[in-house]
């Protein structure tokens, strides 16, 4: 099984000053890791939950528990995503997430239901559970997205508690980065750790959510793909759902998740849809300044319960939960292998 941290370390930009919390590796380009035809799609009965990365597994388990207890899909997604948001050892989400270059922890999240209702927050500070605030945006406002101070004001009006999210461990790593990098915008080992979750519930309805603290040491005010409906997350209940992880700028440039769903609408399988959009991102970025450290991954789930994951580079894995095989991790297929 691929190790998520090893994978993230290999996305680091090696030409910049490297601190002790960073890792570097090269890659071997154009290595196609094509699966056998029968393994391209994993067909399942509903319900089914898939989410990105190892820390998606405890999120899945909590969501599954809530779903089996009769909670709504949105409530189940919220409950699951709150698990990594509250875990200080997950340095890419919520409490304990790595800060921006100013030492501020800023959070992004979104959530979407089967009726295409959605809520989102970005550049939110001081609130441990942005997924819950995003859900309140969906439920209690006429808007889709609230940002920055406005998102914070809304959260406080909804009864959320403001608190310091910068843990001593994350602060220590940030200060080390400042010292070693001389304030250069280094891509950090924990940069690409968005938790994205997709769900097909007992009634056959789709929903999804994303939560992240974004790119470590990012410029203050930077927002990635995760809170953007159509980039980090998209679903159409008649077709399927998709979500992204990786370098948000690349996903935004291609409206990644929306394009995966549109390809499924045209008859593509979840695997083929994820693969085609990943190839599109590669073709648009192969001569781009981001390319030497670019990594993106997608997960997709269609109305029939077929699911898949695919990434540009090796190491991406995702959690799957269903009644057939229980809770487990699966490795995504990929286009390019990293050198060892």
Model segments located where?
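Alpha/propeptide regions of enzymes that mature by internal proteolysis
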Residues: 2, 12, 16-17, 31-340
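Boundary at the C-terminal end of the N-terminal hydrophobic targeting segment
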Residues: 26-28
